[in-house]
Amino acid sequence: FMNAFLIASLLLDRRPPRMKPSRYPAVSILIAAYNEEASIADTLRSIANQDYPGAFEVFVIDDGSHDRTAAIVDACDHDWLRLLRQPHNAGKSAALNRGLAEASHDLVVTLDADSFLYRDALRNLVERYMSDPPNTRAVAGTMLVRNSRRNWVTKAQEWDYFHGIAAIKRVQSLYQGTLVAQGAFSIYDRATLVEIGGWLDCVGEDIVLTWAML
């Protein structure tokens, strides 16, 4: 039934096509990191390889890590990168709110410290946001399992991501009603984030944030 509904919705899709804007806006990227020494370098490398035509700034908020996360970020030589240190582990919401307070651009992207972006990911996300109706305040990025062919567990996770996240979000977007813009990769209107008070300190902070925007 889910697949049939998805196909029917795609055939009847009236969502505006994704267009290239005349000017790509500057964006602020927030990455909350806690003990992410195994992945943070790859995440930053994927950002450095983006083909995004506009400017961007990246804030890695080290949430009191006990490993080499902060040292790895500090060693990266990028003029768009800033490391913010939390004095102790206060949770992901507090880290993101710290980054939001420092962000200087009107569009804010959240990215997990173990997310890896395809080269065109940021450009596609911004184009989708800019092409949607003027009252759009957030757009969820596409999420895939990076190691989906490794074993049966990752294959099962890929299936869960497709039906539980990708397919459902695709259908919701056709009706301009995405219920969750996941924190792993989404874009938000900064003024709206500030207006609703940012991220609440709770489990599923991205869910609560999205619902506050609806």
Where are these regions (language model features)?
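Long helical/loop segments within the catalytic core of UDP-sugar-dependent glycosyltransferases
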Residues: 2, 93-95, 119-203
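Acidic helix N-cap motif at the loop->helix transition within catalytic regions
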Residues: 39-42, 67-75, 120
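Short aromatic/hydrophobic "clamp" motif used to bind/position activated sugar donors
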Residues: 108
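The conserved acidic donor/metal-binding loop of glycosyltransferases
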Residues: 112-116
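N-terminal membrane-anchoring/stem segments of glycan-assembly enzymes
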Residues: 1-23
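Short, acidic, metal-binding catalytic loop of nucleotide-sugar glycosyltransferases
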Residues: 45-55
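A conserved acidic beta->alpha catalytic loop
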Residues: 62-71, 88
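Cell-envelope/extracellular polymer assembly enzymes that use nucleotide-activated donors
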Residues: 25-28, 57, 208
